[in-house]
Amino acid sequence: MIMLNRILGLFLACLVSGMLSARNAKELYIYHTNDMHSRVEPFPAYFPDSVLADKAGMVRRAAFIRGERERHKNLLLFDSGDFSQGSPYYNLFKGEVEIKLMNEMGYDAGTIGNHEFDFGLDNMARLFRMAEFPIVCANYAVEGTALEGLVKEYTVIERDGIRIGVFGLGAPLEGLVSRANCEGVKFEDPVAEAQRIADLLRNRERCDLVVCLSHLGWDGTPYSDVKLIECTRNIDLVLGGHSHSYFEKPKRYKNLDGMEVPVQQMGKHAAFVGKIIVTMDK
């Protein structure tokens, strides 16, 4: 059962929350980011957008995650895409800085955002080879391209006897990515692919928890997190991106079985890190 969520602003202050749980329950601490857009340095304190002022920065985030790992052994860290594009670091080094810093933070998995294509497939392949965490995306068929063998449909992680299945979904490429930068990559129906993978994770892989890293966007498009939840089953949690939506707490929508599934998204620039505590009876 997903019990609690808190938003953690990266300005060296955070909410500290207590939680009561059953004596034999196990807890997973899931932290997540989306749409970092190469925000390597923090925003200055005088930045005109007060929501972002004196927040973000990858060194801050790394220090925060390091501290959380010391407190919580069952910690997972995910990214929902678009770590690329938005600063001179990306323009000069084409994603190498961001990937290396994500490696240092110990990300457990990430999915593909549309801006990962900005310097083409060969550059994506170079970055994905550098990544020390799996890149998951179930609805981009990459066979015959530079990405073949570098993108997985899903990954399974074990923490304290709990099996967590994680898969990713990417946004439609047409209109977002130039054809030259994604030639040979085929976009497939994310709802159909999500159902296929969720069933596989639940049944064949015997996962206790199924998590979707989505770069579809929250709502209002033909493919969205809302539609994804409402048209599928066997997905327990959606960690979103792409629409730069900021939720102070998860939104919940009913799936095909009438079960409420939470979706969370943390705005942009990784100014905030999402935290969700999952309590398992296992």
What kind of feature is each model-predicted range?
Residues 2-13:
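Sec-dependent signal peptide recognition
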